[in-house]
Amino acid sequence: MGTKWSKSSLVGWPEVRRRIREAPTAAEGVGEVSKDLERHGAITSRNTPETNQTLAWLEEMDNEEVGFPVRPQVPTRPMTYKAAFDLSHFLKEKGGLEGLVYSRRRQEILDLWVYHTQGFFPDWQNYTTGPGTRFPLCFGWCFKLVPLTEEQVEQANEGDNNCLLHPICQHGMEDEDKEVLVWRFDSRLALRHIAREQHPEYYKD
């Protein structure tokens, strides 16, 4: 019986079906805009700069000089487990993040760079609360934030070459728990979603 969906229409369908199945889904722990991008392929009207902090921040960055364009050169998409995992290993191999003192501004620069070059909407790099080690909410991201001891902070502050505005000289002023945090790579974070185990309440829709 002839219908629009005849056998000839199914040519190539197995490949399309495979691609649909393999299409990456947003990683657990991403923000509301990334969930929109996964579900609808676009940012919906429920997320605006007035209702979403990350969108408001991106709008603000448009008007600020940050050293590179803040408009993505590729389509905006949600961070996936595989992309977070690959990015973690790329940054570990290239160096620059491991052991770097964390600050909100440094996170913003990293988020903007990833958004600009890869298109991943910058609501994926969030961490559990302190005190102590902060684990990433986004499953696949293998960098956690680890507090330095007072002795480590004092050693890092020795000498005359320290800038007062450097995050380590702020002695944790930016942190609610007054801890100086550094990024640390931990490959186990790709296997165990520690943030979800410790804080299941963060993952309720």
From Swiss-Prot:
Keywords carried by this UniProt record? AIDS, Apoptosis, Early protein, Host cell membrane, Host Golgi apparatus, Host membrane, Host-virus interaction, Inhibition of host adaptive immune response by virus, Inhibition of host autophagy by virus, Inhibition of host MHC class I molecule presentation by virus, Inhibition of host MHC class II molecule presentation by virus, Lipoprotein, Membrane, Myristate, Phosphoprotein, Secreted, SH3-binding, Viral immunoevasion, Virion, Virulence
Keyword Secreted tagged: yes
Question: What post-translational modification does the entry describe?
Answer: The virion-associated Nef proteins are cleaved by the viral protease to release the soluble C-terminal core protein. Nef is probably cleaved concomitantly with viral structural proteins on maturation of virus particles. Myristoylated.
Q: Please give the residue ranges the record annotates as the region Binding to ATP6V1H.
A: 148-180
The domain section of the record reads: The N-terminal domain is composed of the N-myristoyl glycine and of a cluster of positively charged amino acids. It is required for inner plasma membrane targeting of Nef and virion incorporation, and thereby for infectivity. This domain is also involved in binding to TP53. The SH3-binding domain constituted of PxxP motifs mediates binding to several Src family proteins thereby regulating their tyrosine kinase activity. The same motifs also mediates the association with MAPK3, PI3-kinase and TCR-zeta.
Organism, as annotated: Simian immunodeficiency virus (isolate CPZ GAB1) (SIV-cpz)
> For the region Acidic, what residue ranges are annotated?
62-65
Sequence motif Diacidic, location on chain: 174-175
Which family does the entry's similarity section mention? Belongs to the lentivirus primate group Nef protein family.
**Topology of this chain in the membrane:** Lipid-anchor
What is a GO molecular function of this protein? GTP binding
Q: Where is this region: Mediates dimerization, Nef-PTE1 interaction?
A: 108-124
Localization, UniProt:
Host cell membrane; Virion; Secreted; Host Golgi apparatus membrane
Q: Gene name, please?
A: nef
Residue positions of motif PxxP: 72-75
- What is the recorded function of this protein according to its Swiss-Prot or TrEMBL entry? Factor of infectivity and pathogenicity, required for optimal virus replication. Alters numerous pathways of T-lymphocyte function and down-regulates immunity surface molecules in order to evade host defense and increase viral infectivity. Alters the functionality of other immunity cells, like dendritic cells, monocytes/macrophages and NK cells. In infected CD4(+) T-lymphocytes, down-regulates the surface MHC-I, mature MHC-II, CD4, CD28, CCR5 and CXCR4 molecules. Mediates internalization and degradation of host CD4 through the interaction of with the cytoplasmic tail of CD4, the recruitment of AP-2 (clathrin adapter protein complex 2), internalization through clathrin coated pits, and subsequent transport to endosomes and lysosomes for degradation. Diverts host MHC-I molecules to the trans-Golgi network-associated endosomal compartments by an endocytic pathway to finally target them for degradation.
Phosphoserine modifications at: S6
For the region SH3-binding, give the residue spans. Answer: 69-78
Q: Residue ranges for motif Dileucine internalization motif?
A: 164-165
Q: Name one Pfam family in it.
A: F-protein
Query: What does the record say about induction?
Result: Expressed early in the viral replication cycle.
Instruction: Write the protein's name.
Output: Protein Nef
A GO BP term here is: symbiont-mediated suppression of host antigen processing and presentation of peptide antigen via MHC class II
Summary of subunit composition and partner proteins = Monomer; cytosolic form. Homodimer; membrane bound form. Interacts with Nef associated p21-activated kinase (PAK2); this interaction activates PAK2. Associates with the Nef-MHC-I-AP1 complex; this complex is required for MHC-I internalization. Interacts (via C-terminus) with host PI3-kinase. Interacts with host PACS1; this interaction seems to be weak. Interacts with host PACS2. Interacts with host LCK and MAPK3; these interactions inhibit the kinase activity of the latter. Interacts with host ATP6V1H; this interaction may play a role in CD4 endocytosis.
